[in-house]
């Protein structure tokens, strides 16, 4: 493929830089909730289209918005006073081959089910008000969606996706700390809600983790118990951190707490969306699950975009997969960055440019790495349709 470019990148690898900042917004963060509901809607619409017509029809649900509610958390149990407002907005094909599709009903059920499955203390019937506003897509983009080059979809936009590999030590640490708080710590400590944000800062060989963890009021009797659980969480994070790094790790939890005034991070539902924190698709984690200001990132929201021809989703997922394979399979790669640029109306397996930038390890020459890196990129762009199947089956994350 003539549009694949492999070159050496002259740049200080992230592990050798003095400062590194990494963030992850957990499952219950308002931005992550918006991402999750948007992706759930797209996935269920795709499955229903396939069930009815044997193919995914045009849709995008990547503009979902959350407007925070109002609550009165209290030790021992408070209440939600005004429910969270969720606007499920996007485009969907509502009529096809003489048949109407209940897209609003499908989207609403998908969003409610997502909340029910991921938020233990947030009632999607009582604590959330949903408003479904799915319109039809523009005529020109629907036409691009329907047209194909053979069996290959045509790009719906001129856009780009970015990926990199391998993850740094700090990136792996931040990602896994949030994951394990959600999957492990909360099982023994239901007082910790799903809204957990982890901010990592590495200064040379010292890492500090600042964690914002929403406590659920009904499981905490008083401020003394709150403090004990917070200390237990700090110790848990310190303990598991040694599995990901030998560097010194400091852990800070809920640093805005003021015990004298009784102002602590207490919620009724486990998410800050209940009281003042809005959420939007694409404002949180990139599709690798992280926010990494020290790395190139796409501003595209991957969640909710259709998995057939929306390059804002497909190319970001693919770029990360290409980078991961190159880093794993090509000997001598210290870091690799992949950028894929589409051109609207052109086959998605024929990008305008696919750039692979490699930082070789000491003693390795780019000339020895170029061919295997190119071969991996060429193979994966030729099989870009596999991304679609993985998305519909829920086998890849988008945030």
Curated annotation (Swiss-Prot):
State the InterPro entries in the record.
AdoMet_synthase_2_family, AdoMet_synthase_3, S-AdoMet_synthetase_arc
An example GO BP is: S-adenosylmethionine biosynthetic process
Pathway(s) annotated for this protein in UniProt:
Amino-acid biosynthesis; S-adenosyl-L-methionine biosynthesis; S-adenosyl-L-methionine from L-methionine: step 1/1
Which UniProt key words apply to this protein? Answer: ATP-binding, Magnesium, Nucleotide-binding, One-carbon metabolism, Transferase
EC identifiers of the protein? 2.5.1.6
Domain of life, per the record?
Archaea
In the record, what terms sit under GO molecular function?
ATP binding; magnesium ion binding; methionine adenosyltransferase activity
* Cofactor(s), by name: Mg(2+)
Keyword Calcium on entry: no
- Binding of ATP occurs at 135-140
- State the reactions this protein catalyses: L-methionine + ATP + H2O = S-adenosyl-L-methionine + phosphate + diphosphate
This molecule's function is given as: Catalyzes the formation of S-adenosylmethionine from methionine and ATP.
Q: Which family does it belong to?
A: Belongs to the AdoMet synthase 2 family.
Tell me the NCBIfam families matching this sequence: PRK04439.1-3 (NF003364), PRK04439.1-5 (NF003366)
Q: What is this protein's record name?
A: S-adenosylmethionine synthase
């Amino acid at each position: 493929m003539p549009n694949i470019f492999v070159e050496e990148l002259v740049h200080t690898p992230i592990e050798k830089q003095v400062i590194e900042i990494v963030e992850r917004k957990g499952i219950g963060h308002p931005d992550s909730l918006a991402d999750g509901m948007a992706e759930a809607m797209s996935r269920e619409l795709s499955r229903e289209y396939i069930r009815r017509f044997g193919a995914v029809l045009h849709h995008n649900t990547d503009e979902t918005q959350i407007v925070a509610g109002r609550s009165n958390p209290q030790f021992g149990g408070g209440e939600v006073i005004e429910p969270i407002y969720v606007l499920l907005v996007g485009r969907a094909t509502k009529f096809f081959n003489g048949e109407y599709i209940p897209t609003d009903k499908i989207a609403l059920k998908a969003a409610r089910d997502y909340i029910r499955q991921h938020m233990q203390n947030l009632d999607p019937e009582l604590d959330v008000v949903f408003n479904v506003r799915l319109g039809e897509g523009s005529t020109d983009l629907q036409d691009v969606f329907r047209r194909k080059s053979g069996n290959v979809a045509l790009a719906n936009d001129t856009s780009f996706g970015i990926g990199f590999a391998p993850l740094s030590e700090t990136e792996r640490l931040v990602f896994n700390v949030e994951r394990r708080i959600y999957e492990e710590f909360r099982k023994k400590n239901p007082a910790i809600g799903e809204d957990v944000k982890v901010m990592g800062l590495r200064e040379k060989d010292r890492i500090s983790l600042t964690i914002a963890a929403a406590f659920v009021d009904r499981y905490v009797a008083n401020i003394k118990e709150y403090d004990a659980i917070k200390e237990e969480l700090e110790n848990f994070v310190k303990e598991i951190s040694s599995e990901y790094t030998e560097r010194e790790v400091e852990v800070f939890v809920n640093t805005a707490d003021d015990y004298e005034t009784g102002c602590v991070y207490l919620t009724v539902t486990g998410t800050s969306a209940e009281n003042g924190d809005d959420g939007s698709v694409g404002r949180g984690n990139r599709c690798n699950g992280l926010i990494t200001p020290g790395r190139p990132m796409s501003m595209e929201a991957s969640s909710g975009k259709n998995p057939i021809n929306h390059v804002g989703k497909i190319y970001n997922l693919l770029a990360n997969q290409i980078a991961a394979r190159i880093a794993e399979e090509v000997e001598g790669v210290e870091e690799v960055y992949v950028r894929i640029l589409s051109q609207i109306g052109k086959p998605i397996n024929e990008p305008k440019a696919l750039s692979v930038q490699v930082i070789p390890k000491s003693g390795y020459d780019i000339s020895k790495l170029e061919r295997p890196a190119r071969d991996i990129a060429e193979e994966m762009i030729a099989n870009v349709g596999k991304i679609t199947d993985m998305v519909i089956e829920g086998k890849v994350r988008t945030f």
